[in-house]
Curated annotation (Swiss-Prot):
Residues 319-330 have a biased composition (Basic residues). Residues 1-40, 72-92, 133-158, 173-209, 306-347 are annotated as: Disordered. It comes from Bos taurus. Residues 15-25, 195-209 have a biased composition (Polar residues). This is Uncharacterized protein C12orf71 homolog. Residues 179-194 have a biased composition (Acidic residues). Residues 143-154, 306-318 have a biased composition (Basic and acidic residues).
Length: 347
């Protein structure tokens, strides 16, 4: 067994290397000891590297750098910048390029930090571009952006307060206007209700006065029109008719009209009086009818004429009389014989 184990080690060794074996028992493997020298270790490593380079295209310089790069990046990102991975084989006997490897390691130590910084800034820029409002609110909540824009915040709060104050003022003004309208409207409604019955009937009397106010003597009857409405139901309608008949007889004394005839001509009183308004309306209608009947008579009495119907009939009678007079002036044939005038013969 000892010879078989020593055979592969002696394959790649140059001459001059000494291997000491101490075996007490050929079947005892625990007492096998090797004492390699420095030249032996160097030759073993060079032979292994040459075999790898010929078979796979492996170059030792690239291998050391690539392995160091990858392993150091992983270890620096996971464990921190203080922990560095160094292969045990290279760390034991590669001492020639220590300066170059240390410089390379320093560069690798700096690169992950720069990469992390770049990734953080890119992520921050994307976040700010996507949603500026959320980022600013998060900054404000975290307390990093407390005192950066105090003026803008105060302006926003002031504008909000102004808007609220304006809304409150408008609301209060609307309430005041509603209260004023409610307080004024009942008074005006009461005034209108009180004015309606008192102004309706005098208005009708005024209309009748305007219709029949062409004569000057009609002013004598105006006090009767302007009397209050409440006085109408107190006076009996028969008494009103008699008074009107007396006034008419006085105005037309020359014609000799009797009071009985005038009272018979006037319309009688209503049989049933329901309300004061109905009696007032009927009395106004009676006044209108009386004025229509009095108007031509008063005019004829003032102007010294008879009834207008008689005045219209006279021109017709005069025209007839004139016709008869013209006919009477014509010479008749009997008169011509008596006078002795010859009658011309008819051809």
């Amino acid at each position: 067994m000892a010879q078989e184990l020593a055979a592969p080690l002696s394959c790649g060794q140059p001459p001059g290397q000494n291997i000491t074996e101490t075996t007490t028992d050929p079947w005892d493997e625990g007492d096998l000891r090797f004492e390699p020298s420095n030249s032996m270790v160097h030759s073993f490593s060079s032979s292994s590297e040459s075999n790898l380079s010929l078979s796979v295209g492996y170059f030792p310089c690239e291998d050391t750098l690539s392995c160091e790069d990858t392993l150091s990046c992983e270890d620096s990102s996971s464990e921190g910048p203080s922990m560095h991975f160094v292969p045990p084989i290279q760390g034991s006997w590669r001492t020639e390029n220590t300066g170059r490897l240390l410089a390379r390691r320093d560069q690798i130590q700096d690169d992950p930090e720069q990469f992390c910084k770049l990734s953080i800034t890119l992520a921050w820029d994307v976040d700010m571009a996507s949603n500026n409002s959320d980022s600013t609110t998060n900054c404000d909540l975290s307390g990093d952006n407390k005192d950066k824009h105090p003026k803008e915040k105060t302006q926003l709060t002031l504008s909000k307060l102004d808007g609220l104050v304006q809304k409150l003022e408008k609301f209060l003004e609307n309430q005041k206007d509603d209260k004023d309208d409610d307080s004024v409207f009942p008074e005006s409604a009461q005034e209108e209700d009180s004015q309606l019955p008192s102004s309706s009937l005098p208005g009708m009397a005024q209309v009748s006065h305007q219709e029949y106010g062409s004569c000057q003597d009609l002013a004598k009857f105006n006090p009767l029109e302007n009397e209050d409405v409440n006085q109408f139901p107190q006076i009996h309608p028969r008494l009103q008719n008699q008074e009107l008949a007396k006034i008419i007889s006085k105005a037309t004394g020359s014609q000799g009209t009797d009071i009985a005839e005038i009272s018979s001509v006037l319309p009688g009183p209503p049989e049933k009086e329901d309300t004061h308004s109905s009696t007032g309306a009927l009395s106004c209608l009676n006044f209108r009818w009386v004025f229509r009947w009095l108007r031509p008579q008063v005019r004829s009495s003032l102007l010294g004429r008879e009834d207008p119907r008689e005045a219209n009939e006279r021109p017709r009678e005069l025209a007839r009389k004139k016709r008869f007079s013209y006919r009477s002036k014509r010479i008749q044939p009997q008169e011509s014989f008596e006078l002795g005038h010859p009658i011309p013969p008819d051809f």
